């Protein structure tokens, strides 16, 4: 029997303690690039299932690639749907980023999808990758309290309901989706617009008022540092796709121009 090194969830504990967590977005859907990210020293990595070409078959090798990494894998699910979340739990994810949460009811649904009864509605399989195929004896006793739920606020309705969402039991943090939020506020492609920035600051303040850490994606260093000053706890400061695109263009330009 293998030793159980999956509990407690250190990322969840770090968020609860309001310790700064610096992360990176993983969008290339490739185990090699994900493994490289896992060697860099980030506290957490988002494996994107909403906008990146990921599915169960691509997530599993990426989780394997991060097995020895100190970086906590966080999966952004394609949608807030219990069956999708159940399958991602079963393959070994413990940290979830739920996109486009607009109401308290949607936040409650997200939490319930990750919990076994009676606390939730997660379906039960006795042998899967997450419990090392039945070799973790305390898995069912430990699972519910070791799942991290981060919900994204990225619409006007979400902003309007941020207090109720942040107060939802089982929600571990509030994450701002700056691009969709900008679009919702009428500033598509311009997350730096003053109205968007003011709204981000408001979301951070409301999350803090409920004792919940807040996070954001900020690939521009000046933005990331400003959000940290505003009280953000978990910030993704770049993406593998962005770094790769920028570095390859810079290399080509050095010789072609």
Curated annotation (Swiss-Prot):
It catalyses: 5-dehydro-4-deoxy-D-glucarate = 2-hydroxy-3-oxopropanoate + pyruvate; 2-dehydro-3-deoxy-D-glucarate = 2-hydroxy-3-oxopropanoate + pyruvate. The gene is garL. GO terms for molecular function: 2-dehydro-3-deoxyglucarate aldolase activity; magnesium ion binding. This is 5-keto-4-deoxy-D-glucarate aldolase. It comes from the Bacteria. Homohexamer; trimer of dimers. Its cofactor is Mg(2+). Keywords: Lyase, Magnesium, Metal-binding. The record marks 76 as: Transition state stabilizer. The keyword Zinc does not apply. Pathway: Carbohydrate acid metabolism; galactarate degradation; D-glycerate from galactarate: step 2/3. Belongs to the HpcH/HpaI aldolase family. KDGluc aldolase subfamily. Binds 1 Mg(2+) ion per subunit. Pfam families: HpcH_HpaI. It comes from Citrobacter koseri (strain ATCC BAA-895 / CDC 4225-83 / SGSC4696). GO terms for biological process: D-glucarate catabolic process; galactarate catabolic process.
């Amino acid at each position: 029997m293998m030793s159980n090194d999956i509990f407690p969830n250190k990322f969840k504990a770090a968020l609860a303690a309001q310790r700064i967590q610096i992360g990176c977005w993983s969008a290339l859907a490739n185990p090699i690039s994900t493994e490289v990210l896992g060697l860099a020293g980030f506290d957490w990595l988002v494996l994107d299932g909403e906008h990146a070409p990921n599915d169960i078959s691509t997530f599993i090798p990426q989780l394997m690639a991060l097995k020895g990494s100190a970086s906590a894998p966080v999966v952004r699910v394609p949608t807030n749907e219990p069956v999708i979340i159940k399958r991602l739990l079963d393959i070994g994810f413990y940290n979830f980023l739920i996109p486009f949460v607009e109401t308290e009811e949607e936040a409650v649904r997200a939490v319930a999808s990750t919990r076994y009864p009676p606390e939730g509605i997660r379906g039960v399989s006795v042998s899967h990758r997450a419990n090392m195929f039945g070799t973790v004896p305390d898995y069912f006793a430990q699972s519910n309290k070791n799942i991290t739920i981060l919900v994204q606020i990225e619409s006007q309705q979400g902003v309007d309901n941020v207090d109720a969402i942040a107060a939802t039991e089982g929600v571990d943090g509030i994450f701002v989706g700056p691009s969709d939020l900008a679009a919702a506020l009428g500033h598509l492609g311009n997350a730096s617009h003053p109205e968007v920035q003011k709204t981000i600051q408001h979301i951070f303040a409301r999350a803090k008022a409920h004792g919940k850490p807040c996070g954001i994606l900020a690939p521009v260093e000046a933005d990331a540092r400003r959000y940290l000053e505003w009280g953000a706890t978990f910030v993704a400061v770049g993406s593998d796709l962005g770094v790769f695109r920028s570095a390859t263009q810079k290399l080509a330009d050095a010789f072609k121009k």
